[in-house]
Amino acid sequence: MRGAFYIAIALLIVRSRTATGNAKSDVSRPYVVATGGESTKATPKRYLRGGLALSATNEERMDATVLSKDAKALATEGEDWLRLSLGPVGHSQTPQLKRKFDSLSAIDESSPSKKLATPDRAFTRRFRAEDPQLPKYSKIHQTFLNIPHMPHKISLTEAVLMYRMVNWKNGSSPTKQKSAEALLRLVERTSADDLERALGPTSVRLASQKKIRDEYFKNLTTMYARVHAFCHANPAECTNESTHSPLERKMKAPPDIVLFPLFNR
């Protein structure tokens, strides 16, 4: 009896596999599961999904992943990219997926000396001695320190920013939005120590952060207005010698010709 039982089980397994092989379908097409059919009548039954009698073949069909054409293309590109990453490539055509990935990776590799930095770190860095323009910046700083009626003693960072702004080709006027945005970026990136130096320790301790930065922005606006007026009155002191600089153009402009009347009335 035991031998006959094992033989029956083996026959059932063989017939189940045969039916599975005959009933293979293209999984790339949407599939509607049927609870029975000529190819599944003799296959083992399992009671699944709310008590419906489903064959083992149909269960495998239901568990199969249905891939769309876009998913197939993406999988193919992924396999190509893995082959390129893990081993030598037999073709010269780079898959689209690898090209996209490499273009993203190459953004930072093109300049390995540049490191990612927070806005604070980028804007509060000090001008080091190896900077070739440091002597020029120091001279400009000393010039701006002599401008009267400044709200506070201008720092090297503030002086360099305003020196660059006053030489802009367009938008260098203190009333322009471009100038206001540049000063606002400086306010947002100024450290607490620099705010205390500019406004004084008492003002910083008693006021809120918003009031502190608003006050600092007001000071910068006043300072730049005076720097702008000074530089346009003395363009030789502030020009960066660029042909686009309004100060340089002002220096090289021909003098105004004064026409005297021929006859006195």
UniProtKB/Swiss-Prot annotation:
Induction: Expression is up-regulated at the earlier infection stages. A motif (RxLR-dEER) lies at residues 46-61. The keyword Secreted applies. N-glycosylated. The putative N-glycosylation site at position 240 is essential for cell death-inducing activity. Changing N240A: Impairs host cell death-inducing activity. Glycans are attached at N170, N219, N240. Effector that acts as an elicitor that induces cell death and promotes ROS accumulation in Nicotian benthamiana. RxLR16-triggered cell death is dependent on SGT1, HSP90 and RAR1, but independent of the somatic embryogenesis receptor-like kinase SERK3/BAK1, indicating that it acts independently of the detection of cell surface pattern recognition receptors. Enhances the expressional levels of defense-associated genes involved in the salicylic acid-, jasmonate acid-, and ethylene-mediated signal transduction, resulting in disease resistance. Belongs to the RxLR effector family. This is Secreted RxLR effector protein 16. It comes from Plasmopara viticola (Downy mildew of grapevine). The gene is RxLR16.
